[in-house]
């Protein structure tokens, strides 16, 4: 395949197997969501792609050729921990990283001007990073990842901490890069965004790929999901229902008047127990079948309750020389 491909990648830290037979890829122009619980191995996988770690087993290719220091220069990286200098101006920040990429000062200034215009930072060239909003700091961080004209962007939690307007802006910028043929791999715990943006999703759990495909493909299961909407918070309804339920119940604290029921069987009918308890509770405004959310898919089908290795623990083991 064109672009990035991981072939049976494994990685251990001491006796702890962090990744086991990880196999997936990112094509040019494709947006791939990389999701899983804390400790699933996402950060380790990204570090392997970037060459910060070597795999215990398996190999990585770029356009069908073994990945190397040279073709890794085609990868732009935006870490979760932002690496910006707070007392440097926006333009100087971008110029600095462009110089590190090997550009001349003239080329670096030209690239900075181009990215400032492209990413909506015009008028803020001389503003210090510490004086920018978090959303604009994220734009600068994205600009830094683009100074080398990458063919692949690896973004670790790019939406973390952003308000809704800044999220929409960042999402639009990512889509813009994909439309220009750049492959995008990003991790996020904001699953609604993953559903909205991604062509494909790769689900990692305890170091193994549990699913890899379009969200619509993952949602095409032999189960039916129903949404019940009430005219008031439905906590008491859920409490009574949970005593007799043989099906999955979702009750979101952010929207306490909606309850989601998932039952086995394609096009299955709503269980009679649910209707009877809803009638006793009263105030049901509607009931209709809906697609299972990505969050429901993960919690029910793909993500275990066990924890893997966290980035902090990974760093401890690595610094102690226990990696292999």
Locations of the language-model features?
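Conserved ABC transporter NBD signature motif
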Residues: 58-71
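Conserved ABC ATPase "signature" region
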Residues: 95, 99, 107-124
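Catalytic Walker B motif of ABC-type/P-loop ATPase nucleotide-binding domains
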Residues: 153-157
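ABC ATPase "signature
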Residues: 212-213
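Short, charged/small-residue-rich alpha-helical element at the C-terminal edge
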Residues: 224-301
């Amino acid at each position: 395949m064109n672009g990035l491909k991981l072939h049976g990648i494994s990685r251990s830290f001491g006796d702890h197997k962090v990744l086991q037979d990880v196999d997936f890829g990112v094509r040019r122009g494709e947006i791939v969501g990389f999701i899983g619980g804390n400790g699933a191995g996402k950060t380790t996988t990204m570090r392997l792609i970037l060459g910060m770690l070597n795999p215990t087993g398996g190999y990585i290719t770029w356009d069908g050729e073994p990945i190397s220091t040279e073709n890794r220069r085609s990868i732009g990286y935006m870490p979760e921990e932002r690496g910006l200098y707070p007392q440097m101006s926006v333009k100087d920040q971008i110029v600095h990283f462009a110089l590190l990429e090997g550009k001349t000062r003239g080329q670096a200034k030209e690239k900075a001007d181009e990215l400032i215009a492209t990413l909506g930072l015009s008028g803020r060239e001389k503003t210090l990073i510490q004086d920018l909003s978090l959303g604009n700091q994220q734009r600068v961080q994205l600009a830094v990842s683009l100074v080398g004209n990458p063919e692949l962007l690896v973004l670790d939690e790019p939406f973390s901490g952003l308000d809704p307007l800044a999220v929409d802006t960042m999402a639009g910028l990512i889509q813009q890069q994909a439309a220009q043929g750049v492959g995008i791999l990003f991790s996020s715990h904001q699953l609604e965004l993953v559903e909205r943006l991604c062509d494909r999703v790769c689900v990692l759990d305890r170091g193994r790929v549990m699913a890899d495909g379009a969200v619509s493909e993952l949602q095409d299961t032999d189960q039916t999901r129903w949404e019940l909407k009430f005219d008031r918070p439905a906590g008491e309804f859920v409490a009574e229902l949970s005593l007799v339920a043989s099906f999955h119940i979702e009750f979101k604290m952010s929207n306490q008047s909606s309850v989601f029921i998932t039952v086995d069987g394609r096009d299955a009918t709503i269980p009679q127990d649910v209707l009877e308890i809803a009638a006793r509770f009263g105030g049901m405004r509607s009931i209709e079948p809906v697609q299972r959310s990505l969050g429901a898919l993960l919690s029910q089908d793909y993500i275990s309750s066990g924890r893997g290795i966290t980035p902090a623990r990974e760093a401890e083991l690595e610094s102690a020389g226990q990696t292999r």
